[in-house]
Structures are given as C-alpha cells and as structure tokens.
Amino acid sequence: MNLHFYSTLRFTVALAAGLLFGFGLALSEMINPIRVLSFLNVASGHWNPSLLFVLGSALAVAFPGMALQRRLKRPLLDECFHLPSKKVIDRRIVFGSAIFGTGWGLTGLCPGPAIASLSTGLGSVLLFVAAMAAGMIIHDRIVVRSLS
C-alpha cells in the first residue's frame, strides 16, 4: 500500500472518529457540567441517570472491539496495538484517580468533554482547559522526571 495513501487513510479515520466522538459528547450533553453533576449527585434525591446510556453505549462498542482485538495480530492502520503494559493498581493510580474524581465532581468536566466544550467559547471552560494543561505539564516536569 502506498505510504501517502496509508497516512491519509489513518488521518481520515482519526478525523472521523474524533468528529463522531465530539458530536456524541455534545448530543448526550456530556459537555454540560450541570448534566454531569446531576448524574454524579446520586444522594441528592434529584439524580439524573441519563448518562448511564453513554456508559452503556461505550461498553456495547468496547466489549466486541476488545474481543476482535484479541483475534487480530495487528490493527488495520497501525503496526501494533497500543495497550497499557502496567496492570498493577499502585498508590499513584489511586491518588491520581482521587484527584481526577475530585476535579470531575467539583466541576462536572473531564478532559474529553472539556476539550469539546471549547466550542462554546465560555471563559470558564477556557480557564479549565488551560489549568488542566498546566496540571499535565507540571506532572510531566515533576513526577515523570523524578521517576527517570
């Protein structure tokens, strides 16, 4: 297969997947922090379980996709599958998950929906994404460098 065609096809598939993902985030209202917070607020008596459909849809695609992946030697548009090699739940994972969950619970935003929410042009979303990026940079400069 021609290398240019292969690169163009990979780019096109990534673009289509990103467009589909972003459209789905907006359509399901995952980019609406109030909707997300009402989903996370189970104990309030005003819990909105509608985002369970988002989770259910993700699982309905992921399970067959993972079963197919186990049968394939390599993906169609890459040299290998990029799967996590770390399988241990350690203090970093637990602590990072707690920080992530705290931020998600306080703001109703997590990375994918926050980036998709940039389309709204809201200052609070711009500030959130800038702070999120700063947090990732700080992590890379402090934590990753201290481990190497």
Swiss-Prot record:
One of its GO terms (cellular component) is plasma membrane. This is Probable transporter PD_1893. Probably part of an operon that comprises bigR, blh, PD_1892 and PD_1894. Keywords: Cell inner membrane, Cell membrane, Membrane, Transmembrane, Transmembrane helix, Transport. The keyword Lyase does not apply. InterPro entries: DUF6691 (IPR046513). Belongs to the TsuA/YedE (TC 9.B.102) family. It comes from Xylella fastidiosa (strain Temecula1 / ATCC 700964).
